[in-house]
Amino acid sequence: DFSYMHVNDLGCMEFAGGYPKNLHEEINNYSIIAGVVARQQEFDIIHAHDWLTYPAGVHAKMVSGKPLCIHVHATDFDRSRGKVNPTVYSIEKDGMDHADCIMCVSELTRQTVIHQYHQDPRKCVAMHNAVYPLSQELQDIPRVEHPKEKVVTFLGRITMQKGPEYFVEAAALVLQRTRNIRFC
């Protein structure tokens, strides 16, 4: 019975999208919908892609009994630089506790999951983000050589945990030791 839920004139739940003021309510509503879908559809595995979807994945697992595999791009330890939000941590940990498989984007993230969230290393695997190798045509393009200079390029996301401020901080540390580096 979902009579307590707010629905529109068509009897549908409306989602705000983005990061609304009622984010946790949105996460809960999404979880309810996942449970309904899990009861009605046939599937083999549940994949929850980052902490916002972990409650939905857990709910679908409880309803269906199917295995839950979660994807961890970053933890709140990474995003907050150690100033962890207890609510977010709780959601992340609950998702990890219920997961049958935890896919982490790096070995560093895997170690964070194991040690900060107390997860069994046997169910945690590092699955690195990757790119396709350059085609031979691109590899054959002549490059300007700077034999005495090393080049470091920022390719991160413009967010706190991967943002340019880390690049600038790292550049300052490197330049304290050597000057033959170009940052771009």
Q: Model segments located where?
A:
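A conserved catalytic-core segment of Leloir-type glycosyltransferases
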Residues: D1-Q41
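Conserved donor-binding/catalytic core segment of Leloir-type glycosyltransferases
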Residues: R143-A172
